[in-house]
Amino acid sequence: MAAIAAVAARRRRSWLSLVLAYLGVCLGITLAVDRSNFKTCDESSFCKRQRSIRPGLSPYRALLDTLQLGPDALTVHLIHEVTKVLLVLELQGLQKNMTRIRIDELEPRRPRYRVPDVLVADPPTARLSVSGRDDNSVELTVAEGPYKIILTAQPFRLDLLEDRSLLLSVNARGLMAFEHQRAPRVPQESKDPAEGNGAQPEATPGDGDKPEETQEKAEKDEPGAWEETFKTHSDSKPYGPTSVGLDFSLPGMEHVYGIPEHADSLRLKVTEGGEPYRLYNLDVFQYELNNPMALYGSVPVLLAHSFHRDLGIFWLNAAETWVDISSNTAGKTLFGKMLDYLQGSGETPQTDIRWMSESGIIDVFLMLGPSVFDVFRQYASLTGTQALPPLFSLGYHQSRWNYRDEADVLEVDQGFDDHNMPCDVIWLDIEHADGKRYFTWDPTRFPQPLNMLEHLASKRRKLVAIVDPHIKVDSGYRVHEELRNHGLYVKTRDGSDYEGWCWPGSASYPDFTNPRMRAWWSNMFSFDNYEGSAPNLYVWNDMNEPSVFNGPEVTMLKDAVHYGGWEHRDIHNIYGLYVHMATADGLIQRSGGIERPFVLSRAFFSGSQRFGAVWTGDNTAEWDHLKISIPMCLSLALVGLSFCGADVGGFFKNPEPELLVRWYQMGAYQPFFRAHAHLDTGRREPWLLASQYQDAIRDALFQRYSLLPFWYTLFYQAHKEGFPVMRPLWVQYPEDMSTFSIEDQFMLGDALLIHPVSDAGAHGVQVYLPGQEEVWYDIQSYQKHHGPQTLYLPVTLSSIPVFQRGGTIVPRWMRVRRSSDCMKDDPITLFVALSPQGTAQGELFLDDGHTFNYQTRHEFLLRRFSFSGSTLVSSSADPKGHLETPIWIERVVIMGAGKPAAVVLQTKGSPESRLSFQHDPETSVLILRKPGVSVASDWSIHLR
């Protein structure tokens, strides 16, 4: 017993030292990230091997005599001219202007991982036909669209053309590399294979290959091929080197975006001579800005933009991935490019992209646009659209690590009412649970969680509690016992349950790649299983990269084993998506499939948009972190993840009051709006600041809540079409080169342009208003400005430049109450901003704000408002929808209007009625008072 007690004491000390070390990093707020904890490309052996291959003639040749053309795909064998290993290329034309390329081993020693559960369905194909052929190439025509694919045999290459214009080339630089599986080397002096240096995999069909000497030379094992060590961690690599890589050349393209998550510029940078962009979900403490290091999530989607074309590349691989970017115009200034143009330079701009992944197959979708909105639709057709969030989740969220107890929560709740500040959600971090045992409540601090939740519900507010995917190893903890007994944990390579260190101390990690595990997890959110939960409790998934304090790079060992025998290296980047998926499914199931979920996740992958919101992780209370939140969320929006935000105020350190105010002002115009703070920071609820800062924050909150109908409509459009809510300016103005690198301002939909104030002590900002023959109206003063131009605008502590584009109509709620649920039946005010042609258009989506009835019962309204010829018309934009609602039109504000002699309202079946109005000749603003018509009815208002 004494020995057992001593071991237990050592384990407690070990756990404490690890947690203190973790906290030391978090609390050592003068320190930046310790880069030595995270690999560079040179320290990642497969990246180093892949990157050592230089451009040249590819060693791969297509064997055209093996070409087979079926109804859905073309297949052809590829051979490596040195190793003689055969691969199989599967090429598919897809509907909606897409092409899919898959390359795998023809006869693998064991199957290679193919990423499941990301695509919403098998994409419908467009038939390929052979339209030309010679000894070294085949020309293929895609049945849908004016596209051709040229397959060149030697060296292997693919070219995609529209008519005679080259859109994209594959393997044009000869950088394709596919590390085939092989038997580990056996030293000559050893006669027993078990005595070899590498781990011996199980015998599988295909064993017994006898490579020729040329093959052996080509397959010479480099350091890290069969075993790799990083710091104190060893990766056994029982299946040897299995990396894949491929290059893509984009002629005519200079501007590329996407592949989040990185704390870097919106426009991706050239990586030659530096580090590639890394995609490997990691818990990075106090991440640095303006570098390509990996962060919490990975979306392997890249967008390329030019004046005349947009393209997308979706690299479907869940393993560690690096992306190299090169350009033949890198280093040239805008003046230099203009000079080339004026002098008739024949050099076509080109960007080259190189993808490198540690395992899996090559599986890539080429999305051919031609417009960026086409690319958005194409990607959404593959991986799904942004889930329609419940209305409350678009309101303001108040969080910190941690609110102490029930009394603290209720005091914060009351504080918002006492200071006339709206709030929808209060959050609880890890301290709310009993000893970090998730699905429980601390019996001392939160003895009556149902009473607390009921009190919040009476205020029409919600609570979010954290549920992380690491489970305390404790024989008295029901969650752990069930997972262990059902064999649902991730395993070590020897078959035991994997254990690592995280917040609870020793923890095991549920294997979310297992459908049984996901079903079990979802069931845990039922009200019977999650004691103390209620319908107004929602969930936050943190640490789901997964974070392992004592693991390599603060994550799981790559040779850990998942469902189906797959290694963690194969599935790493999809783990967080599975956690998000299972949690969202659990919240849906607990309501019998009626209620929409809200789940925030830190880790993500392609497809995560279907399950909820994400955020930019543990940022810092510094002005540069405020600035970087814009390109970080814009990059996510471009690849489908619209529901993004950054911790308002910064997670680490204490923000000065001015910074906190500016962060609220920016957060009010970002999709996910949550203030959050570290355990060691001072309390920063808005009413704790001096009155002038309180007033500025209150104004920001009011702006957010008044725009909720607009936000909700934008999210419905994102849900239906796949269009981003928060957009770079270039998305709306694809031919305006001035917008291509702008990342300090952005648009919401096509209507609002926002330029946050992100410099300390700023008295003004430079705002670029794009668009030939566009007009922009300041939403506060209604002053009209013409585009394109750059304006210097003075700002005060309480102001932030926001403009409404002429030609748009924005619906608003003007009666701000304590929460969104208190406002959902309030009347609407329409803000009509007229274009120079005197026209405008906008939409309004309404439903009950929280159920799936808009889908299952068509209980919704989608209204279209159009202004033309001095008439404002309301009509249904989707006749399938129907909704009984008390909401009516309270007011119409028309910017850019002259004074009419009369204003007349017409509704079906009713006589004309005159409306009272007020006109300001200085601002050209016309206000129509109380039309009094139902938002659900058809009507028209005529200015005479």
From Swiss-Prot:
One GO CC term on file: glucosidase II complex
UniProt key word Transmembrane helix: no
Reactions the enzyme catalyzes: N(4)-(alpha-D-Glc-(1->3)-alpha-D-Man-(1->2)-alpha-D-Man-(1->2)-alpha-D-Man-(1->3)-[alpha-D-Man-(1->2)-alpha-D-Man-(1->3)-[alpha-D-Man-(1->2)-alpha-D-Man-(1->6)]-alpha-D-Man-(1->6)]-beta-D-Man-(1->4)-beta-D-GlcNAc-(1->4)-beta-D-GlcNAc)-L-asparaginyl-[protein] + H2O = N(4)-(alpha-D-Man-(1->2)-alpha-D-Man-(1->2)-alpha-D-Man-(1->3)-[alpha-D-Man-(1->2)-alpha-D-Man-(1->3)-[alpha-D-Man-(1->2)-alpha-D-Man-(1->6)]-alpha-D-Man-(1->6)]-beta-D-Man-(1->4)-beta-D-GlcNAc-(1->4)-beta-D-GlcNAc)-L-asparaginyl-[protein] (N-glucan mannose isomer 9A1,2,3B1,2,3) + beta-D-glucose; N(4)-(alpha-D-Glc-(1->3)-alpha-D-Glc-(1->3)-alpha-D-Man-(1->2)-alpha-D-Man-(1->2)-alpha-D-Man-(1->3)-[alpha-D-Man-(1->2)-alpha-D-Man-(1->3)-[alpha-D-Man-(1->2)-alpha-D-Man-(1->6)]-alpha-D-Man-(1->6)]-beta-D-Man-(1->4)-beta-D-GlcNAc-(1->4)-beta-D-GlcNAc)-L-asparaginyl-[protein] + H2O = N(4)-(alpha-D-Glc-(1->3)-alpha-D-Man-(1->2)-alpha-D-Man-(1->2)-alpha-D-Man-(1->3)-[alpha-D-Man-(1->2)-alpha-D-Man-(1->3)-[alpha-D-Man-(1->2)-alpha-D-Man-(1->6)]-alpha-D-Man-(1->6)]-beta-D-Man-(1->4)-beta-D-GlcNAc-(1->4)-beta-D-GlcNAc)-L-asparaginyl-[protein] + beta-D-glucose
Family according to the record: Belongs to the glycosyl hydrolase 31 family.
Annotated stretches, region: Disordered: 180-238
Signal peptide: 1-32
Xref: Gene3D superfamilies: Glycosidases, glycosyl hydrolase (family 31), Golgi alpha-mannosidase II
Protein name according to UniProt: Neutral alpha-glucosidase AB
Binding site for substrate: 283, 429, 602, 676
Recorded GO MF terms: carbohydrate binding; Glc2Man9GlcNAc2 oligosaccharide glucosidase activity; glucan 1,3-alpha-glucosidase activity; glucosidase activity
Catalytic site: 542 (nucleophile), 618 (proton donor)
Function: Catalytic subunit of glucosidase II that cleaves sequentially the 2 innermost alpha-1,3-linked glucose residues from the Glc(2)Man(9)GlcNAc(2) oligosaccharide precursor of immature glycoproteins. Required for PKD1/Polycystin-1 and PKD2/Polycystin-2 maturation and localization to the cell surface and cilia.
